[in-house]
Design a protein with these regions (language model features):
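N-terminal cap/lid segment of alpha/beta-hydrolase-fold proteins
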Residues: 57-117
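Short, surface-exposed "cap/lid" segments of acyl-processing enzymes
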Residues: 95-150, 154-163
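Gly/Ser-rich "nucleophile elbow"/oxyanion-hole loop immediately N-terminal to the catalytic nucleophile
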Residues: 118, 179-221, 237
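Cap/lid segment of the alpha/beta-hydrolase catalytic domain
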Residues: 127-134, 144-195, 249-254
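Short glycine-enriched nucleophile-adjacent loop
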Residues: 224-235
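The feature captures the conserved acid-bearing segment of alpha/beta-hydrolase catalytic domains
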Residues: 249-297
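Catalytic histidine neighborhood in serine/cysteine hydrolases
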Residues: 296-312
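Surface beta-strand/loop "capping" patches
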Residues: 324-368, 382-391
Length: 449
């Protein structure tokens, strides 16, 4: 035998043996890497219903006080008279300070209709920021909803005021301070503002002299996200309306605020949830609303307001809030958008969607956008009218394919107009980064030096 060949075979055989032995030793010494198991890691994270007994300890007596009570002509329908009550109550005490809540309640002048079995206990609660925002919410949400639906409606300041008159919202960082001092993660805006809603239902129930309520509860941003927490805790919440705030939780780690994300505790929320967002939403990644929707077994009804920002003064918000109330309490039908898609054909983009509705469809639009900003901030969305083609609606755009599009439907039923939309659909590989938070200020705004 050739000695060189024998040596080669021996060397290779020895190397293989060493490799196998080394691999076996490594397998014994270091366990195989496993991907992060979010479901397992989050199994014992408490949800709102389990946390409530701890949070409840901070609640205080309502001390509900009526400060004015008058009959007024409705601005929305001057033929109607409304009872307008200005009141105040307390919800909780944190860091030695009570949270107080100015509120305005509207009912029909003659409220006997709301004592009938089919209407008894049905109420609307709108969470509002304080200061100048509050009066706008009274005039644009509270009074029109009460006038047109005839359901008792409360607009309250949430998170409210301290006894010295200063705004809790300007001091909302106290929750982060308390969390760090105590190690208790339930100090969270979505939790403490939910307590406000629960106490508001107690105050409303006391005012109306009822044994139970069925409340549509909602508001903008944290005032909306906290309403889902209230729904998980309190069965009196019959529906939730969220206006803006597209925060999502990570699934590659456990974040301290996980307990208060709707998708995480969705098994505790058995009511319809409406999301009224905006294409220029602040501080979140574009398309986060898609993640929010995909994680829910019971999808939200969505309206993404084109070319609007993180704020709560859009006419569509006023309109859709009332539409949601009419849907939940009186069965006002909603349009449903499905099978949203597109096709490239001879230099054109054809947009399609199936739209089903028992309401009268007044307009169907495709909204599309081109982006030159990875944050997708301050972009202009343009629309195309869609027309019925067979069992779908279609619109065609010639030229370059957009970076994203969505479908929106405007309809009317039972005298209540409204809008719903699909989630935005991404069409290209345009980058997407998290937006730098600027509230409702534009991308090019900078603070003064």
């Amino acid at each position: 035998m050739d000695k060189r060949k024998a040596c080669t075979r021996t060397t290779v055989g020895a190397a293989c043996a060493i490799f196998v032995l080394t691999a076996c030793l490594c397998a014994q010494e270091a366990p195989a890497w496993k991907p992060f198991d979010f479901d397992e890691a989050s199994r014992n994270i408490p949800k709102p219903r389990e946390i409530w007994p701890l949070v409840r300890e901070h609640t205080v007596p309502l001390e509900f006080e009526i400060r004015s009570d008058e009959i007024v002509s409705s601005d929305t329908d001057p033929s109607k008279k409304l009872r307008k009550v200005t009141a105040h109550f307390y919800s909780q005490e944190l860091a030695g300070k009570k949270w107080g809540h100015p509120c305005v309640i509207f009912t029909p002048e003659d409220n006997r209709r709301n004592l009938t079995p089919e209407r008894k206990g049905k109420v609307v609660i709108v969470g509002s920021p304080g200061r100048d925002y509050f009066d706008v919410h009274v005039d644009k949400y509270g009074e029109p909803i009460a006038a047109k639906t005839a359901y008792p409606t409360m607009v309250l300041s949430n998170p409210g005021r301290y006894p010295d008159g200063s705004d809790v919202e300007r001091d909302i960082g106290i929750l982060s301070t308390l969390r760090k001092q105590t190690g208790k993660n339930y100090y969270n805006m979505n939790c403490q503002l939910a307590v406000v809603y629960i106490q508001a239902m107690n105050a409303f129930q006391q005012f109306l002299g009822l044994d139970d309520l069925n409340a549509v509860v909602g508001g903008h941003s944290k005032r909306g996200r906290s309403a889902t927490v209230a729904a998980a805790i309190d069965p009196r919440v019959g529906s939730v309306i969220i206006m803006g705030n597209e925060g999502v939780y990570a699934t590659d780690r456990i974040q301290w605020h996980l307990s208060f994300h709707h998708a995480f505790f969705q098994d505790q929320v058995d009511v319809p949830v409406f999301y009224i967002g905006a294409t220029n939403e602040d501080g979140y990644k574009m398309f986060n609303v898609n993640i929010m929707q995909e994680r829910l077994r019971r999808p939200m009804t969505i309206e993404m307001i084109p070319n609007y920002c993180h704020s709560n003064f859009s006419e569509i918000q006023f309109m859709d809030f009332m539409m949601c109330v009419a849907h939940v309490f009186d069965g006002r039908p909603l349009s449903r958008i499905s099978e949203v898609g597109h096709q490239r054909q001879q230099g054109r983009t054809i947009f399609r969607a199936r739209i089903e509705s028992e309401a009268k469809i007044q307009v169907a639009k495709t909204w599309y956008v081109y982006t030159d900003d990875p944050a997708w901030r301050d972009l202009m969305w343009y629309h195309l009218l869609m027309r019925k083609v067979g069992d779908h609606y279609e619109a065609t755009l010639s030229g370059k394919i957009p970076d994203a599009f969505m479908v929106e439907v405007g309809d009317i039923a039972m005298g209540f107009p409204g809008y719903v939309s699909s989630t935005p659909q991404k069409l290209t590989d345009a980058p997407v980064i998290e937006r730098r938070s600027r509230g409702s200020l534009p991308r090019l705004w900078e603070p003064s030096e």
